[in-house]
Amino acid sequence: MVTLCGSTRFKEQFLEAQKRLTLEGNIVISVGLFGHSGDEEVWTEGTKEMLDNMHKRKIDMADSIYVINVGGYIGESTRSEIEYATRNGKEVEYLEPLKKD
C-alpha cells in the first residue's frame, strides 16, 4: 500500500502516478482534494489543518509514500510528510530523482 504525497498543484501527475502504481499492483491512497487546482473548500478556516492531519493517517496506513516532486519541487507540507513517513519507518520513493545540492 502506497500513499501519494506532493503539492496538489500537480493534479495530472497525481492521477498519472495513481494509475501507474495501481496497474503495477499497488493499493494507492491519494489526496482527497486538489486545493491548488480549484477546490476552494481547502482554504476555509481549519480545513487545511484537518486535511494535513488526515493525510498523515493515510501515511500511517501505507507501507511507503510516493512523492510527486515535479521539477524537483517539494513544498513545506510535503517535506513534513516525508519527515513523518521516515520517522515512522516508511519507504520513500520519488517521481523524479532528488537533485544533489
What are these regions (language model features)?
Residues 1-101:
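Conserved catalytic or regulatory cores that recognize and/or transform ribose-phosphate-containing ligands
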